[in-house]
From Swiss-Prot:
The lineage of its organism: Eukaryota, Fungi, Dikarya, Ascomycota, Pezizomycotina. ABC transporter; part of the gene cluster that mediates the biosynthesis of KK-1, a novel cyclic depsipeptide with 10 residues which is a promising active compound with high activity against many plant pathogens, especially Botrytis cinerea. Is probably directly involved in the secretion of KK-1 and thus confers self-tolerance against KK-1. Keywords: ATP-binding, Cell membrane, Hydrolase, Membrane, Nucleotide-binding, Repeat, Transmembrane, Transmembrane helix, Transport. Disruption phenotype: Decreases significantly the production of KK-1. Induction: Expression is positively regulated by the KK-1 cluster-specific transcription factor kk1F. PANTHER family: ATP-BINDING CASSETTE TRANSPORTER, ATP-DEPENDENT PERMEASE MDL1, MITOCHONDRIAL. It is a multi-pass membrane protein. This is ABC-type transporter kk1G. It is found in: Cell membrane. Belongs to the ABC transporter superfamily. ABCB family. Multidrug resistance exporter (TC 3.A.1.201) subfamily.
């Protein structure tokens, strides 16, 4: 298989207008999507989306444009498909010619006084039957070649399109990618791409074959009798007018529905990404309900298409049977006047036009698929066409990374807030080869400096890199939920939009021209003139929240070599560099203890490692390429004191002879810096060494240091022999779970029952039996539509027999039976209309219900379920979308058509046996089993192929969404080519695996598609013998023949839906398997009541993760009295956060007991037990929606007074009320429109609103600057001072827990020391040494 080739990325000048518009649209459509309830954004989409100028408009030209992603091989395969599809399509028109000759021979033989002998009749019949068999062979070969060719090209082009989308996404500016939800990426790269793939493969071949079929039939009809053909074609304009009027509104409705589905997918991704917080606060039901609101709006919109779906088949069927009546009526007139010499000519014209018109109805399915693909492709092309800038420039030797970085009079504001300057005339020189630390309060510009150095933004005079969105082209920000909070920072003290560490985060959309003046240079070269990729290869960066890929530790570190001169080294040479980097980052010790060592999988975002372990791997990754510039953005914030000291010494070593930029809030880490730069409000206010800056008692730096000082009043001692390095603390997994654990923790029921179609889908339908009215309408429609075929066989036989009559009787009988076709047309039209509309309503409602239930069941799974690497957020989001879509596709018109086929087959079998059992036995039990057997084998192959497709595309989707989630890391590490390469490799693997099965599956498909002709050949041959002996008359023969052919057609229709059935069955099984097992509530004990807080006791508790040989907790014993403030400290991996996880019952202990007021917590209902506690984690979790919604999420119902009091307790009320919209201010994704401290205090308010008996704080202030930490710390102390609440704090920064009632120092899974701050200092043990490391005044 040749490589998947892609067209080159478009230059800035190419298609500039379209690119500019799509860049605006991309930023617009990804801007903060409003959250929960009846948001204006959702209402706007529902009512105005089709008219919104900024929204991408679906166009069929985008469907055809998809083919431009093919290669010469693909174009050859497509051409071959077109040619062979024409051949396969013309088989039936040629068969009609033969059929006409047969009918003529039959009537000539049975006309009274005929001179045709039996021998002559049999010889002619044998010859014509053989011709039909030759047509079967030709159609089989052509069908196989066309379907195989288009499947190959369709898979290849689809893979190229997916890769182009991902490549274009990573070519966008940071400001644009920042606004892209990974959930949307998952939806587009799976669901949307799958829709496109289906439309450019199977449905493309079907459409082309159908067009050739239709044209061929009309050519045959016109040759046989052009007047009769024109009469027979009178229904065609009616069909074209109806379909032409139907599709535009159908496209608009579908496009709006897609928007709702994308929003629902984005929200689902957020939920899966923060599942621990959801479980801790018991918000599963509320968030699932909000997700259901979005799905309900999508369903309400999609129900508007029900009348249109009713017209999918109805017009074609009405026209077809109407044409039958009109054509026979006119043909009989012409026949009696001698203008038509043979009844065979009438039959050929009639059947040709009839089949052509009927085929127009069948063309509806691929056309609808193509219409959906046009919408899906438009969404993909918005990103693909978005403009980007040339990143090339000078590199070595013209410029070097070993040069000073100079800011000269730099003024900068983000595009989203052009009136809020972040940097104000900054003049700063970062000396080459020296360590420069940058400190300052939140919003002072620290992270902005890093962003400018990394060239996430450029200084361009008066405009920023991000594109400006023309507000006349898009809805107002209020309707699209571009965060209103951005507009109000002019009037607050917190003027910058902040992200990690409370610093400025890049804007989420561009709203106008912004200030970007001044000069930024490296040496004597302006940074704008430097090649971006080369420049980033000179920088090693460690961020505060390290992002690791779901890969091995080794690969995560080797990723640091991407885009550098070391990238091409051998594996052995890279291994040496990895080992060296691990030693320098102090990561070698804990890696060596892991069973798989460097080959250990780190899990989604490094979930299987502790925060300290993740950080050290990130440090190793940043220094492995030996960069001349090292940027450490809070590189040690998540590391314990012992590890911090070791890592800090390592960083001191690697910083030598290297330009190092350190951003830190924990000032103990930057005491040794060569220069400390103090920023305030975007300006440099102080600069010097640690000692020099401390001399200014009124300075900003002095105030920051004073806020972090520890009380060290214990008597000094010269005995420091027990160094931190000699304290053995197991560095095992701390913060999160691995793939499993030992003990009796709650596991998901992994039993997956792969039941059949009737059991799985039938169960879904039966459970919704309250829709019995719609079900009844569907049944009536199915019975009516299915009964048409036996009735058609009977009426057709009667009309053919009319031509054996003469004179007035011929005209009388002919007119009567022609009129009966008109009656049949009215009945079948009504049946199909009712069926199409009702089945669509059922499918929409069932899909809404079960997609909502699917997510609700997913988020109620045990935490272990989400620890599994196959259940990553991206994978689950993709599955949620694709499984629901597959079920809906089948439960709509597809299932109805399959049921009609069953009714048809049954009715045709009955009428055939009633009128001629001999011919029926031959036709139905000799030829038909071949069709059934081919279909069954095809079904099995399609199921296997579907399983492979789902597996591979799920993996590729997971990889893509993970890459988007960590895009800053991807850009910083120059991993874009590697990401594309690995994604390309995944896609190619899918293509190869899928095609291996497609070769055999296509044989069966071609057989089931063409065996109808073989059945006809056999029927005519044997029927001819029965007619020759006059055992059968014409009425008997044509009733049986038509019934057999209709039965074979029905079987073909049934098996044409087997791929959808296979996919939908698997999807339904997955949906049902997510249902939880019921638990008897009476088996739980009631919670003991207490007004003085809760006493917590660990009795001999041990805990071990399944993938770890070393236990995290080993016989842990500790007791916390009611109302106490307890702190847990210790090295990374000592079990601090695991202790909180056990308290939250994310996991259960392997052995021992955890007591809640003296009672084992495993005896309580987990939901009721968790209502007694609240968790505030290091990384606050906020969702799209208003501030009020985010705070009140933790309780079922809360009054305004309760919410405001919780915010006052969390010291965030004043800030919220300073916003123009106050508590109704809407937040963007993850609440990134707030600073870190503001997000943390909102999280604390949410926790306090529950009025918990137990408050758990897991590194709640570790990522905050001194100013924000002060606010949060005061809020925590206020919450703990009430005396009726037990507070448990996990912290690395010891200044935050020195006032705790009791401090537990953990190590090796046990308590090493306990006591209050002063008592532990007097011991001069582990805690004393930890304090020594953080004492800034020592």
């Amino acid at each position: 298989m040749s490589a998947i080739e892609l067209p080159p990325l478009r230059s800035r000048s190419e298609e500039a207008a379209r690119a500019e518009h799509n860049a605006q649209t991309l930023a617009h459509e990804n801007a903060n999507i409003a959250g929960y309830d009846e948001s204006p954004a959702v209402q706007q989409v529902e009512t105005d989306a089709p008219e919104t100028k900024g929204a991408p408009q679906a166009s069929f030209k985008n469907y055809f444009r998809v083919f431009s992603y093919g290669t010469k091989l693909d174009y050859f395969l497509i051409s071959l498909c077109c040619f062979t599809s024409i051949g396969a399509g013309t088989a039936m028109p040629l068969m009609n010619i033969v059929f006409g000759k047969l009918v003529g021979n039959f009537t000539d033989y049975f006309i009274p006084g005929s001179n045709v002998t039996r021998q002559e009749f049999e010889a002619e019949i044998n010859k014509l039957a053989l011709y039909i068999f030759y047509l079967f062979i030709g159609k089989f070969a052509m069908s196989y070649i066309s379907m195989l060719a288009i499947r190959i090209s369709g898979m290849r082009i689809s893979a190229a399109l997916r890769l182009a989308y991902l490549r274009a996404l990573f070519a966008q500016p940071v400001s644009v990618i920042d606004t892209v939800s990974p959930g949307k990426v998952a939806n587009r790269i799976t669901t949307s791409s799958n829709i496109v793939q289906l439309a450019i493969s199977q449905h493309f071949a079907t459409l082309f074959q159908s067009l050739a079929f239709t044209v061929g039939l009309y050519v045959v009809a016109l040759v046989k009798g052009w007047k009769l053909t024109l009469i027979a074609s009178t229904g065609l304009p009616f069909i074209l007018i109806v379909y032409g009027a139907m599709f535009p509104p159908f496209l608009r409705i579908h496009q709006i529905t897609d928007k709702f589905q994308e929003e629902a997918s984005a929200m689902a991704y957020e939920m899966f990404s923060s599942i621990r917080m959801i479980v801790a606060f018991g918000t599963e039901s509320r968030l699932a309900k909000q997700h259901g609101v979005m799905l309900s709006k999508a369903a309400s919109n999609e129900k508007r298409a029900a009348p249109l779906m009713g017209l999918t088949m109805s017009p074609a069927m009405v026209a077809m049977y109407g044409i039958f009546g009109i054509t026979f009526w006119f043909g009989i007139k012409e026949y009696t006047k001698g203008r038509i010499s043979s009844v065979g000519d009438i039959t050929v014209v009639l059947f040709s036009v009839m089949m052509a018109v009927m085929n127009i109805g069948r063309v509806a399915s691929p056309i609808i698929s193509i219409a959906k693909a046009a919408t899906a492709a438009t969404e993909l092309f918005v990103t693909i066409d978005a403009s980007f800038h040339d990143t090339s420039g000078v590199m070595e030797p013209e410029v070097t990374g070993n040069a000073a970085i100079t800011f000269i009079n730099v003024a900068f504001s983000y595009p989203s807030r052009p009136g809020v300057p972040i940097l104000k005339g900054l003049d700063l020189t970062i000396t080459a080869g020296k360590v420069t630390a940058i400190v300052g309060p939140s919003g002072s510009g620290k992270s902005t400096i890093v962003g400018l150095i990394q060239r996430w933004y450029d200084l361009l005079g008066t405009t920023a890199t991000a594109k400006k969105i023309d507000e006349t082209e898009i809805p107002s920000s209020s309707t699209m939920a571009s965060s209103p909070i951005e507009a109000v920072y002019d009037n607050t003290d917190k003027k910058s939009k902040k992200g990690k560490a409370g610093e400025e985060e890049e804007p989420e959309q561009d709203l106008g021209p912004n200030t970007c003046t001044g000069s930024l240079s490296v040496g004597r070269t302006n940074l704008r003139n430097v090649d971006v990729r080369w420049w980033r290869s000179q920088i090693g960066m460690v961020q505060q929240e390290p992002f690791l890929f779901n890969d091995t530790i080794y690969n995560n570190i080797v990723f640091g070599l991407c885009g550098t001169r070391y990238e091409g080294l051998s594996k052995d040479e890279k291994k040496i560099m990895v080992d060296e980097a691990c030693r320098e980052a102090c990561a070698e010790e804990f890696i060596s203890r892991l069973p798989q060592g460097l080959d250990t999988l780190v899990g989604e975002s490094g979930i299987k490692l502790s925060g300290g372990q993740r950080q050290r791997i990130a440090i190793a990754r940043s220094i492995i390429k030996r960069p001349p510039i090292l940027i450490l953005d809070e590189a040690t914030s998540a590391i314990d004191v012992r590890t911090e000291r070791i890592v800090q010494e390592a960083l001191d070593r690697v910083s030598k002879n290297r330009t190092t930029i350190v951003i830190a809030h924990r000032l103990s880490t930057i005491k040794r810096a060569d220069s400390i730069v103090v920023l305030r409000q975007g300006q440099l206010v102080e600069q010097g060494t640690h000692e020099e800056l401390l001399k200014n008692g009124d300075g900003v730096y002095y105030g920051l240091v004073h806020a972090q000082e520890l009380e060290m009043d214990a008597e000094d001692d010269d005995d420091h022999s027990s160094s931190l390095e000699n304290i053995k603390m197991n560095d095992t997994k701390e913060d999160t779970a691995s793939s499993g654990f030992e003990g009796h923790a709650s596991r998901e029921d992994s039993t997956y029952q792969n039941v059949g179609l009737l059991h799985s889908l039938g169960r879904l339908v039966v459970e919704q039996r309250h829709h019995w009215i719609l079900y009844s309408v569907c049944c009536i429609g199915i019975l009516g539509a299915g009964a048409v075929y036996p009735l058609q066989a009977y009426i057709f036989a009667r009309i053919i027999n009319v031509f054996t009559l003469t004179g007035p009787e011929l005209v009388k009988q002919g007119n009567f039976w022609a009129g009966m076709f008109g009656v049949l047309a009215g009945g079948v039209g009504l049946s199909y209309y009712l069926l199409g509309a009702a089945s669509h309503l059922i499918s929409v409602e069932l899909t809404r219900k079960y997609r909502s239930e699917y997510l609700s069941n997913m988020i109620r799974k045990p935490i272990l379920f989400f620890d599994d690497k196959v259940h990553s957020p991206g994978s689950l989001t993709s599955r949620l979308s694709s499984d629901s879509q597959q079920v809906q596709q089948l439960l709509s018109m597809e299932m109805s058509m399959a049921l009609i086929a069953c009714t048809n087959l049954l009715g045709c079998t009955i009428i055939a046996f009633v009128y001629g059992w001999k011919l029926s036995l031959v036709g139905l039990f000799a030829a038909l089993p071949l069709i059934l057997g081919a279909g069954l084998v095809r079904t099995r192959l399609e199921i296997q192929l579907e399983a492979e497709n789902a597996k591979v595309f799920e993996n590729s989707s997971q990889f893509a969404t993970e890459a988007v989630a960590g895009f800053r890391t991807v850009l910083s590490l120059l991993m874009e080519p590697m990401i594309r390469s690995r994604y390309d490799k995944l896609l190619k693997g899918h293509v190869v695996e899928a095609l291996a099965k497609a070769k055999y599956g296509t044989i069966i498909f071609a057989a089931s598609d063409s065996l109808e002709l073989a059945c006809m050949s056999l029927t005519f041959w044997y029927g001819g013998k029965l007619l020759a002996s006059r055992e059968y008359d014409l009425i008997q023969f044509f009733i049986v023949y038509t019934a057999i052919i209709q039965g074979a057609t029905a079987a073909g229709i049934w098996f044409s839906f087997t791929p959808s059935m296979a996919q939908a069955t698997g999807a339904a099984n997955r949906i049902l398997s997510m249902r939880p097992t019921s638990t008897d509530p009476s088996s739980y004990s009631p919670l003991p009541c207490s007004d003085e807080g809760v006493g917590i006791e660990f009795q001999h508790v041990s805990f071990k993760y399944q993938s770890r040989d070393v236990p995290v907790l080993s016989n842990l014993n500790l007791q916390i009295l009611p109302g106490q403030v307890a702190a847990l400290v210790g090295s990374s991996g000592c079990g601090k956060s695991t202790t909180l996880s056990l308290l939250e019952r994310f996991y259960d202990a392997s052995s021992g007991h955890i007591l809640y007021n003296g009672q084992d917590i495993t005896t309580f209902s987990p939901a009721e037990y968790r209502k007694q506690m609240s968790l505030v984690s290091q990384e606050p979790t906020l969702y799209q929606g208003s501030i009020r919604e985010n705070i009140s999420l933790s309780v079922e119902s809360a009054s305004d007074d309760d919410i405001k009091q919780a915010c006052r307790d969390a010291q965030i009320h004043d800030f919220i009320t300073s916003l123009p919209e106050g508590y109704e201010t809407r937040l963007g994704p993850k609440g990134m429109s707030l600073s870190g401290g503001q997000r943390q205090r909102i999280s604390l308010a949410r926790a306090l609103l529950r009025k918990p008996k137990i408050l758990l704080l897991d590194e709640a202030t570790s990522s905050l600057d001194s100013e924000s930490e002060k606010y949060v710390q005061e809020a925590i102390e206020r919450a703990a001072s009430e005396g009726d609440r037990t507070v448990i704090i996990v912290a690395h920064r010891l200044a935050t827990i020195q006032k705790a009632d009791v401090i537990f120092v953990l190590g090796s899974g046990k308590v090493l020391e306990k006591g209050d701050h002063q008592a532990l200092l007097r011991k001069k043990g582990v805690y004393w040494q930890m304090c020594q490391a953080q004492a800034l005044n020592r």
